[in-house]
Curated annotation (Swiss-Prot):
<keyword id="KW-0689">Ribosomal protein</keyword>
<comment type="subunit">
    <text>Part of the 50S ribosomal subunit. Contacts proteins L11 and L16, the A site tRNA, and the 5S and 23S rRNAs.</text>
</comment>
<protein>
    <recommendedName>
        <fullName>Large ribosomal subunit protein bL25</fullName>
    </recommendedName>
</protein>
<dbReference type="InterPro" id="IPR020056">
    <property type="entry name" value="Rbsml_bL25/Gln-tRNA_synth_N"/>
</dbReference>
<dbReference type="InterPro" id="IPR011035">
    <property type="entry name" value="Ribosomal_bL25/Gln-tRNA_synth"/>
</dbReference>
<dbReference type="GO" id="GO:0008097">
    <property type="term" value="F:5S rRNA binding"/>
</dbReference>
<feature type="region of interest" description="Disordered">
    <location>
        <begin position="205"/>
        <end position="237"/>
    </location>
</feature>
<feature type="region of interest" description="C-terminal domain">
    <location>
        <begin position="190"/>
        <end position="237"/>
    </location>
</feature>
<dbReference type="GO" id="GO:0000049">
    <property type="term" value="F:tRNA binding"/>
</dbReference>
<keyword id="KW-0699">rRNA-binding</keyword>
<dbReference type="GO" id="GO:0022625">
    <property type="term" value="C:cytosolic large ribosomal subunit"/>
</dbReference>
<comment type="function">
    <text>This is one of 3 proteins that mediate the attachment of the 5S rRNA onto the large ribosomal subunit. This protein has three domains. The N-terminal one is bound on the solvent face, the middle domain fills the space between the 5S rRNA and the L11 arm contacting the 23S rRNA while the C-terminal domain is on the edge of the intersubunit interface and contacts the A site. The protein conformation changes upon binding of a tRNA mimic to the A site, although the mimic does not interact directly with CTC itself, consistent with CTCs presumed role in moderating A site binding.</text>
</comment>
<dbReference type="InterPro" id="IPR020930">
    <property type="entry name" value="Ribosomal_uL5_bac-type"/>
</dbReference>
<dbReference type="InterPro" id="IPR029751">
    <property type="entry name" value="Ribosomal_L25_dom"/>
</dbReference>
<keyword id="KW-0687">Ribonucleoprotein</keyword>
<dbReference type="InterPro" id="IPR037121">
    <property type="entry name" value="Ribosomal_bL25_C"/>
</dbReference>
<feature type="region of interest" description="Middle domain">
    <location>
        <begin position="105"/>
        <end position="189"/>
    </location>
</feature>
Length: 237
């Protein structure tokens, strides 16, 4: 996509309709200004993986990728753009968005697909061969399964720049409801009381099956212990 830019000095103040920008690589550094509306339209279409042919008035034309966009947090509008100059036919490392397709087996079972890494670093064989996105098919994934960076099929000529063991997508178990969470906490408490000898296995089973509350069986256990202590004292006398 083509962008026309105006030359500027690094500290030059700009009109509100313009955005300050810089393009660079290891050898060059060029400061310029872009029409705000034109850049907004172009960036929505291209994002960070799209190639821009930037022509500076009275100067050169060069291909570049968006490296970073500095935003005005209050106005939610870009105030500065960094471009990275690239060369046609030369490999370029880029961050490509990851998206999923399909409905996983884990989702059918109530699980949740979690995209852990939203952008993956790859090396494309040239600026014109950068994929717009990496699509991961999650159809066969079950709860507990995960897909690593090394599992993802890349377009021809592209190679992975990230750790191949990096988890990119996983399927999480269903989230517990408030009642399920309360039941898990209670089960842990009951197990602890049984292990400490403060609750019988019969009483624990009654609580877990809903036949009695934990407070009720604890009260009964206290009464039983009190009765046992009284009998022991009588025998001692």
């Amino acid at each position: 996509m083509e962008l026309t830019a105006k030359p500027r000095t690094p500290k030059q103040k700009l009109d509100e309709s313009m955005i300050a920008a810089v393009a660079y690589n290891k050898e060059n550094n060029v400061s310029f200004a872009l029409d705000r509306k034109a850049f907004d339209r172009a960036f929505r279409q291209q994002s960070t993986t799209g190639l821009f042919d930037i022509t500076v008035e009275g100067g050169e034309t060069f291909p570049a990728l968006v490296k970073a966009v500095q935003m005005d947090k209050r106005k939610r509008a870009p105030i500065h753009v960094d471009f990275y100059m690239v060369t046609y036919g030369e490999p370029v490392e880029v961050s490509v968005p990851v998206h999923t397709t399909g409905r996983s087996q884990g989702e059918v079972q109530g699980g949740l697909v979690d995209i852990v890494v939203h952008n993956l670093q790859i090396v494309a064989p040239g600026p014109r061969r950068i994929p717009q996105e990496l699509v991961v098919d999650v159809t066969k994934m079950n709860i507990g399964d995960h897909i690593t960076a090394g599992d993802i099929k890349l377009p021809e000529g592209c190679t992975l720049a990230a750790d191949p063991e990096l988890t990119v997508v996983s399927v999480l178990p269903p989230r517990l409801t408030a009642e399920e969470l309360e039941a898990e906490v209670q089960a842990a408490q009951v197990a602890g009381l049984v292990a400490a000898g403060e609750l019988s296995e019969e009483a624990a089973e009654a609580v877990l099956e809903g036949d009695a509350s934990l407070e009720e069986v604890k009260a009964e256990a206290s009464e039983d212990n009190a009765g046992t202590d009284s009998e022991d004292n009588s025998d001692a006398q």
